[in-house]
């Protein structure tokens, strides 16, 4: 099927995870004739935008993420107001680690620079602050901030898609894109070709294909896109009887991150009563079309971490439930948000490599992608776009230089 001149779109978005859905919403809201394509069913569980919880935090060692988190917090609230239900559930954010851990000290510096209210605590103050629910070693510190919380991922993606439809966007799932070509007849814009032979015409195109973005960009432009998929395992642990309410979001338990080896993160009990999410930021490299489907998780260090951190109130014998997800990793764990360039110039925008920490910033990323497709200055809100350039890997394969080696925190075995 061909969609002829009268069916042209202003922007075609390829990939309906949280980033593509957020971008489609932004575009449609601004009056752009928008098409959002997804290769699988909408709200599928084969990528990176599903599940029951993601954290939101502003405590980054990299200062340039603060403005994106701050903007996203406002945009999450605006989208919730428009849709009429909640996907963001605020709570404290608590970061912890060795007192000499440079990345954790950079988190404190970020808070100070931006006036983000925070409290730095020693082990005794941490125990008092959380009434014994969290314990840290004597040589550790903890940093508590109010800008934290949980995002409901599947619900959030559905929200953006519903809002996009409400503003006139067209959504099609089970529509896998095979290639993107220049529109030779009109001399401008692109043709998006599907594996079924359909052709969609657009003035602009945004590619947010998640773990599949490297494969698609290689086909489209013949370049090696610096993003590689990784399969990770999310673990849920049972809270011991009588202590369940102490670890709930209503009980003011925080979202949290533990710096060092391993880098551990988690959320309070919300989606599964009586269970708390605690996982390692890591996993195993994979082909998104030939995944091992787990389990692939290192449990011994995580068991020990849980045993030492939660005052014996969480069963550390092993997780009672697990879920699989994919990260789309860049070498420096920073995003790629840029024009594809080459023959496509500024007509194709790419957004990928969100490296296991991008979901919280989806509203700002969607706004930026929409700005770029509409040729509006994308650096609004103080966002430093140079950090996300595709070209940064040309001079240095490792990408952005990090001030401290431990800022690239991924725990993953070397590829063979």
From Swiss-Prot:
The modification S-8alpha-FAD cysteine is found at residue 325. Keywords: FAD, Flavoprotein, Oxidoreductase. It catalyses: sarcosine + O2 + H2O = formaldehyde + glycine + H2O2. Binds 1 FAD per subunit. Its EC number is 1.5.3.1. Its cofactor is FAD. NCBIfam families: soxA_mon. This is Probable sarcosine oxidase. It comes from Arabidopsis thaliana. The lineage of its organism: Eukaryota, Viridiplantae, Streptophyta, Embryophyta, Tracheophyta.
